[in-house]
Amino acid sequence: MVHLTGEEKSAVTTLWGKVNVDEVGGEALGRLLVVYPWTQRFFESFGDLSSPDAVMGNPKVKAHGKKVLGAFSDGLAHLDNLKGTFAQLSELHCDKLHVDPENFRLLGNVLVCVLAHHFGKEFTPQLQAAYQKVVAGVANALAHKYH
């Protein structure tokens, strides 16, 4: 559960309505893989990740980034039940993919940076604070099934 004021929730959902999920998702996942290269080990099947340009131009990275932000959108629609919303993804990432749950926090922080870049002055410090609460809640929900 994420504790947002009514104003914060409105601001988060209003901005999210302007997000180009295809573009932002690919950029966020790509930046995660470039900035934290050890995360690439989970994406070896994506092909060429040999350089920042290769990562950022990789169509599989872009497609998976879109998928990730689609799940994030679902979370925004269910802020009062993030653990339930992400239960299956948590189990998948824990039991089958063996993803370090710290990576969820890292991706959330990268997403906030990408949103700030895309929205400039519209992404106020107050809006950033609200998004930090949301990405922390999502990361916590995704880590829930870990033992």
Curated annotation (Swiss-Prot):
Question: Residues bearing N-acetylvaline?
Answer: 2
Q: Which residues carry this modification: Phosphothreonine?
A: 13
The protein in question is named Hemoglobin subunit beta
* Residue stretches making up the Globin domain: 3-147
Name the gene for this chain: HBB
Does the keyword tRNA-binding belong to this entry?
no
Give residues where N6-acetyllysine occurs. 60, 83, 145
A GO biological process held by the record: hydrogen peroxide catabolic process
Please tell me whether the keyword Disulfide bond is annotated for this protein: no
An example of a Gene Ontology cellular component annotation for this protein is: hemoglobin complex
Keyword annotations of the record: Acetylation, Heme, Iron, Metal-binding, Oxygen transport, Phosphoprotein, S-nitrosylation, Transport
